[in-house]
Design a protein with these regions (language model features):
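Metal-associated gating/positioning segment near the N- to mid-region
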Residues: 1-53
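Residue-level signal for pocket-adjacent positions within structured domains
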Residues: 17, 21, 27, 62, ...
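Gly/lys/ser-thr-rich phosphate-binding loops in alpha/beta enzymes
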Residues: 34-89
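Metal-coordinating catalytic core of metallo-dependent amide/deamination hydrolases
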Residues: 66-170
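Conserved small/polar residues in nucleotide/adenosyl-binding loops
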Residues: 173-174
Length: 174
């Protein structure tokens, strides 16, 4: 259920956007099948809420969402009010296996750490540009340009601001 609904068929398995080791711009809520019959079974077992995350193929796999176990027609009507998004991160075996088998980085734990460092350095620079722009007066904003929007960096900046929580599978020392 969640990003892997049941009954499971390959066309409905949307847990990993395994096209790049860093996919912070994807959101699990866009892959949830709200008609999944497993929700009703879980409710019968007393499960009233879920935190649904992307899979663990990527270093940074995207945003997770908290939902109430209600039978609804849209994911927005299931979202838990005011629950923060989370960011799924994985390091170690899964990213090594997925990308190493393709002869692509990361293929080692060193590659995992390097991918994290690169992403967080870029996110901090993006956040600095946003903060510099926001600190300008309204007049200065009118004659200047806002930083170009970057959906991947927006998610990582949200983590740096403390607005998005991190869920990390297989923590390594970096």
């Amino acid at each position: 259920m969640g990003v892997y609904p049941a009954p499971g068929v390959s066309t409905s398995a949307d847990g990993n956007e395994a096209t790049s080791p860093v996919t912070a711009d994807v959101w699990a809520e866009h892959s949830i099948w709200v008609q999944d019959p497993q929700y009703a079974l879980a409710l019968k077992g007393g499960i009233t809420a879920f935190h649904i995350l992307p899979g663990s193929a990527n270093l940074i796999g995207g945003r997770g969402v908290t939902v109430k176990n209600l039978q609804r027609n849209t994911i927005n009507s299931m979202k838990f009010p005011d629950a923060p998004h989370s960011l799924k991160m994985a390091c170690g075996e899964n990213p090594k296996r997925v990308y190493g088998n393709r002869q692509q980085a990361p293929s080692t734990r060193m590659g995992n750490a390097a991918g994290y460092r690169k992403s967080w350095i870029e996110a901090k620079a993006y956040l600095n540009r946003l903060d510099e722009y926001e600190a300008k007066s309204d007049e200065a904003k009118e004659i200047g340009y806002a930083p170009q929007r970057d959906l991947e960096m927006e998610t990582l900046a949200g983590v740096l601001r403390g607005e998005i929580l991190v869920h990390n599978l297989s923590l390594i020392h970096i």
